[in-house]
Design a protein with these regions (language model features):
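Catalytic Walker B motif of ABC-type/P-loop ATPase nucleotide-binding domains
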Residues: 161-165
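Helix-to-loop junction immediately C-terminal to a conserved catalytic motif
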Residues: 56
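Walker A (P-loop) phosphate-binding loop of ABC-type ATPase nucleotide-binding domains
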Residues: 43-47
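Conserved ABC ATPase "signature" region
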Residues: 103, 107, 114-132
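Conserved ABC transporter NBD signature motif
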Residues: 64-79
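ABC transporter nucleotide-binding domain
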Residues: 178-272
Length: 312
C-alpha cells in the first residue's frame, strides 16, 4: 500500500442518531477521528454496525450529521472512493474466485482492466491469499472469506478503512498478520475504525477505544483509561463458607467492601477493588477460622461491564 499524502482523512459524527421505526439503534453519538486505529467495543446489537454503515454512506443519520473529510457521507459517491468497508455479513460471491472478486471490486471503483488486475494482485498479497486466489470463494473457509473481503476493501487503496468484526473465523496466525497489516496501514496515515465485542482484540490493536452500549457512547479514550474504568467499578461475588454470617461480618469491616447480603444460604458481597478483594478474602477467612468453600465473580461478562459504564 502507498502512504497517504497530506493530513489524515477525518471521520466525524456530531449528535448522530439512527432509528428504525420505534427502535433506536444509535442515540446521539459524537466523536471525531483523524488517523490511527480506533476500536468500536460493545456487545452484540449495541449499534456498532449501524455506526460503520453511516460512516460508509450506506445509511443516513436520522438526526445529526456524519461527515468524512468535512463532507456528508450519505449520497456522496465521491466519498466511496475514499472508504474501504469490510462488512460483517458474507458479502462475497461464492462462484467467483478470490482474484475475480478483487478485480470486480477494483473495476467498480473505475479502474481499467490492467490496473484492476494489478491492484487485485497487490491486495491479495497483503492478506496472504495468493495460494487460494484462483479457487472459487465457495470453497474457502470462514477465515479465508474474511481475508477475501479485506482484499476487496483494500483494492482501491482507500485512506479510510472500516471493518466490522474483521477477525471472525481467523486462526491465531491470521489474526496476528491482520493486526500487523492494519497497524502498518495506520502508520502510513490511514484512518482505521473496526468493531469488536472481544476486549482482547481491541486492546491489542486500537490506539483509541469507543465503548458503545445500547446505541450510546458509554466511554472513550485510550485503552488504559477504559481498563481503569472497568477495573475500578464495583464487583459482585458469591461466596460459600463454613460460617457465612461470620464471614459477612468480617468482610464488612474491610474498606474495600461496599456491601454484603445473605439470601437463601448464599453470601453476596460487593467489592470496590476486584484484585484486592480476590487477594485478601482467603486471609480474612483464615483469621476468623472460617473455611472458604467457594468464591465466584457474578458480573464479569462484558455486558455487565458495559452496563456499568453507561450508568456511571
Amino acid at each position: 500500500m502507498t502512504a497517504v499524502e497530506g493530513e489524515p482523512a477525518s471521520v466525524e459524527l456530531a449528535d448522530a442518531s439512527r432509528w428504525y421505526g420505534n427502535v433506536v439503534a444509535v442515540n446521539d453519538i459524537s466523536f471525531r477521528l483523524e488517523g490511527g486505529v480506533t476500536g468500536l467495543l460493545g456487545p452484540n446489537g449495541a449499534g456498532k454496525s449501524t455506526i460503520l454503515h453511516m460512516v460508509a454512506g450506506f445509511l443516513a443519520p436520522s438526526s445529526g450529521s456524519v461527515t468524512v473529510g468535512g463532507s456528508p457521507s450519505w449520497r456522496h459517491p465521491e466519498m466511496y472512493r475514499r472508504i474501504g468497508l469490510v462488512p460483517e455479513r458474507e458479502a462475497v460471491y461464492p462462484f467467483l474466485t478470490g482474484r475475480e472478486f478483487a478485480v470486480a471490486m477494483a473495476r467498480l471503483h473505475g479502474m481499467e482492466p490492467a490496473a484492476a488486475a494489478e491492484a487485485a494482485a497487490r491486495a491479495i498479497g497483503l492478506v496472504e491469499l495468493e495460494d487460494a486466489a484462483d479457487r472459487a470463494i465457495g470453497t474457502y473457509s470462514k477465515g479465508m472469506r474474511q481475508r477475501a473481503k479485506v482484499a476487496a476493501a483494500l483494492v482501491h487503496d482507500p485512506p479510510i478503512l472500516l471493518l466490522d468484526e474483521p477477525f471472525n473465523g481467523m486462526d491465531p496466525r491470521q489474526r496476528l498478520h491482520m493486526m500487523e497489516l492494519l497497524r502498518g496501514m495506520a502508520a502510513e496515515g490511514r484512518t482505521i475504525l473496526f468493531s469488536s465485542h472481544i476486549l482482547e482484540e481491541v486492546e491489542r490493536l486500537a490506539e483509541r477505544v469507543l465503548v458503545i452500549v445500547a446505541g450510546r457512547l458509554a466511554a472513550s479514550g485510550d485503552f488504559r483509561e477504559i481498563r481503569r474504568l472497568m477495573t475500578d467499578r464495583p464487583h459482585t461475588f458469591t461466596l460459600r463458607s463454613s460460617d457465612d454470617r461470620a464471614l459477612a461480618s468480617a468482610l464488612l469491616a474491610e474498606p474495600m467492601i461496599a456491601g454484603a447480603a445473605l439470601d437463601g444460604g448464599l453470601l453476596t458481597v460487593r467489592a470496590t477493588d476486584f484484585g484486592a478483594f480476590s487477594r485478601a478474602v482467603s486471609g480474612i477467612a483464615r483469621r476468623h477460622a472460617i473455611r472458604l468453600h467457594e468464591l465466584l465473580p457474578t458480573d464479569e461478562s462484558l455486558e455487565s461491564v458495559f452496563s456499568y459504564l453507561v450508568r456511571r
